[in-house]
């Protein structure tokens, strides 16, 4: 069990998640397979990331203070603290722009795993959009439990 709000997407880089490898951390952020790396093909500007390369990550105070039990997050690594909430910054941006056209840039995907599929359930209106998801082969797999729609993701 892993709450979906703890699944962070890092924008500005591209990467794949190799689910055939064991998880490095458990749900509490404790290293259980320290030599494992599920994140593969990590790139910035179309080039592999140098392990010594530095990046600045904008986040909220919950995550920066260790919320979500993400490893290697420490207060001494924070370089700027703003009084604004993420929500307020986004609202101001939308007001300033007047109109925005948000779209997912498909910067991450699952790494291919031969002869493997994953079954998941979601709202039935997902059937209207499954074909629009870039880089993913998603098939309708019928009806799920309690009014949900069932889908098959081909890895």
Q: Which residues does each predicted region cover?
A:
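Catalytic centers of hydrolytic enzymes
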Residues: 1-155
């Amino acid at each position: 069990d892993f709450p979906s709000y703890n699944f962070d997407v890092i924008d500005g880089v591209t990467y794949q998640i190799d689910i055939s490898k064991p998880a490095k951390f458990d749900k509490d952020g404790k290293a259980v397979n320290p030599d494992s790396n599920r994140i593969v093909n990590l790139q910035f500007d179309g080039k592999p990331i140098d392990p010594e390369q530095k990046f600045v990550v904008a986040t909220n105070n919950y995550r920066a203070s260790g919320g979500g039990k993400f490893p290697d997050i420490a207060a001494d690594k924070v370089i700027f603290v703003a009084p604004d909430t993420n929500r307020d910054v986004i609202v101001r941006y939308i007001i300033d722009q007047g109109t925005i056209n948000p779209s997912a840039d498909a910067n991450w995907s699952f790494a291919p795993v031969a002869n493997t599929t994953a079954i998941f359930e979601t709202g039935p209106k997902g059937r209207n959009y499954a074909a629009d998801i870039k880089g993913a082969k998603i098939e309708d797999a019928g009806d799920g439990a309690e009014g949900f729609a069932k889908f098959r993701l081909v890895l």
